[in-house]
Amino acid sequence: MTLGPLMIDLKGVTLDSEERAWLGHSWVGGVILFSRNYESPEQIAALIKAVHALKEPRLLVAVDHEGGRVQRFRDGFTLLPPASLLGKLYDRDQRQAQRLAMITGWLMAVELRAVGVDFSFSPVLDLDRGVSAVIGDRAFHGEPDAVIALARAYIRGMAWAGMAAVGKHFPGHGSVVADSHTALPVDKRSWRQIREGDLLPFEHLARAGLPAVMPAHVRYASVDSRPVGFSPFWLETVLRGQLGFQGAIISDDLSMAGAAEVGDMSARMQAALSAGCDMALVCNDPDGYALLLDELKGDPYPQTSPRLLRLYGRYPLTRSQLYHNPAWQRAVQMLAAYGEF
C-alpha cells in the first residue's frame, strides 16, 4: 500500500465517521491541522493518535507552526517569535542569531513531535522586500545570505528534534503585493532578478538536502504563464533540474484564490500532480471532499511515496519526557529572554 498524494484537513477536535471515510480513501496520504482542531496538548495528541491508527502506512500529519502570527497551537505550547526577530538580531550579532534560530527550530519541532505531528510547513524562505504584507515578518530577512544562514540553523534544529523541514514559498513570494489567499499575484520581474535573489535560499538549501518545498501560488509573468505550483518548468526544469532538489514538493492550498484559474478542485489537484508536486494540499472544503474523492478511482501514483515517506517524524517522545528534558527547559528560558511574541 502506498501513501496517497492528497492532504486534507479536519472539521473539529475529534474525528467523525465522514472524516474517517475520507482519510481511509487510497488517494489521501496526509492531514493538515488548524487552530480549530486544537484545544489542548492532550486533546491534539489523542486526535493525531486516532488519525495514525486509521491505516498503514500511517497518514502524515502536518501543521503551519512558523511562530509569530502563524502558530496554530498556542495554549500549552511555547509562543515562538516571528522569523523577522531572528533577522533583526542577525543584523546585530550573526552568531547569536544563528544560535537562537537553531534553538527556535528545535523547540518548535520537539514540542510538535511530543504530540505526534510529523512536520511543520516551515521555514519561510521568502525574502522580505517590504512589499508583501502576507509574508512580512514571516520572513527572516531581505538579504539572501541572511536568510540562508538563519534557515540552515533553524532546519538543523528541526532535524535534531526529528522533524523534516518544508521550505516555502518557492521561488519567492516576497516581491508581490497581492495575497494568494485572495487573488493570483503576478510578479513581473525578470528571470535574472529572481535567479540572483529569491532563488538563492532555495538553491543553497536544496543542495544541502532540504527535505521538502512548497511552491508559491504566484505567476512570474516574464518566466512562465502558469502559477508555479502548476508549472512543470518551475518544478521540474528549475527546482529539480537546475537547483538539484531531490525532496518532496507539496502544493500550497489548492482552495486558495491563487489556484482558481486552473479549474475545479479535481482539475487543480491533477494539474499540480502532473506539474511535479508529490502531494496536493486541499483545505477548508469539507463539502467538496466527498465529491472529489468520489472522482478519484484506483490506486494513486505509487512513485510519489518514497519522497513523502521521508517526511515522517522521528525520535518520538511524550509530553512528560519533554517537560523533564533540561534542553527543553533551557530553550524555553532562552527564548523568554527575548520577550513576548
Swiss-Prot record:
SUPFAM superfamilies (UniProt xref):
(Trans)glycosidases (SSF51445)
Residue(s) at site: Important for catalytic activity? D179
Tell me, in one coarse class, where this protein mainly resides: cytoplasm
- Asked if the record carries the keyword Cell cycle, the reply is yes
Q: What class of enzyme is it?
A: hydrolase
- Which UniProt keyword terms apply here? Cell cycle, Cell division, Cell shape, Cell wall biogenesis/degradation, Cytoplasm, Glycosidase, Hydrolase, Peptidoglycan synthesis
What InterPro entries does the record tag this protein with?
Answer: Beta_hexosaminidase_bac, Glyco_hydro_3_N, Glyco_hydro_3_N_sf, Glycoside_hydrolase_SF, NagZ_Beta-hexosaminidase
Which EC numbers does the record give?
A: 3.2.1.52
Q: In which pathway does it act?
A: Cell wall biogenesis; peptidoglycan recycling
Say if the entry is tagged with keyword DNA repair.
no
Where is this chain's protein located in or outside the cell? Cytoplasm
Gene Ontology MF, one: beta-N-acetylhexosaminidase activity
Q: Which family does it belong to?
A: Belongs to the glycosyl hydrolase 3 family. NagZ subfamily.
According to its UniProt entry, what is the function of this protein?
A: Plays a role in peptidoglycan recycling by cleaving the terminal beta-1,4-linked N-acetylglucosamine (GlcNAc) from peptide-linked peptidoglycan fragments, giving rise to free GlcNAc, anhydro-N-acetylmuramic acid and anhydro-N-acetylmuramic acid-linked peptides.
This one is known as Beta-hexosaminidase
